[in-house]
Amino acid sequence: MVTPRMLSALSAVLLLVLTASSSARSFDASPSATSGNHSLNKRSLFDPACTGIYDRQLLRKLGRLCDDCYNVFREPKVATGCRSNCYHNLIFLDCLEYLIPSHLQEEHMAAMQTVGK
């Protein structure tokens, strides 16, 4: 049975949730976000050391491997080291060997060469 006190508490929680979500929406709808005038350029999310061909799909694939590797080992050096030098490093190769079946490793190596130096 719902008491008036419980109903009042639920109403207060609902009001807080609605207020928080509407303020978050108004924050997201800032003039720069809605006008298409983004301050970040598309490549700013990726390592500037990657001077090869810019391919979002390949970068996402390589980044996902590093994320998965970090999720397995939970070591901060894995998270940062795997992406260093545009994936040309020992940590990336170790992650590749550990997580990717051997018949698919060449595909990741080719992606690394494409986006790399």
Swiss-Prot record:
What is the protein's known function?
Hormone found in the sinus gland of isopods and decapods which controls the blood sugar level. Has a secretagogue action over the amylase released from the midgut gland. May act as a stress hormone and may be involved in the control of molting and reproduction.
Q: Which Pfam families match?
A: Crust_neurohorm
Query: Which compartments does it reside in?
Result: Secreted
Q: Which family does it belong to?
A: Belongs to the arthropod CHH/MIH/GIH/VIH hormone family.
GO MF terms on file?
neuropeptide hormone activity
PTM annotation (Valine amide): residues: V115
Q: In which tissues is it expressed?
A: Produced by the medulla terminalis X-organ in the eyestalks and transported to the sinus gland where they are stored and released.
In its keyword annotation, does this UniProt entry include Transferase? Answer: no
Annotated signal peptide:
1-24
- Name recorded for this polypeptide: Crustacean hyperglycemic hormones 3
Keywords assigned by UniProt, alphabetized: Amidation, Carbohydrate metabolism, Cleavage on pair of basic residues, Disulfide bond, Glucose metabolism, Hormone, Neuropeptide, Secreted, Signal
Q: What is its main location?
A: secreted
* Cystine connections: C50-C86, C66-C82, C69-C95
**Single GO biological process annotation from the record:** neuropeptide signaling pathway
The record's GO CC annotations read: extracellular region
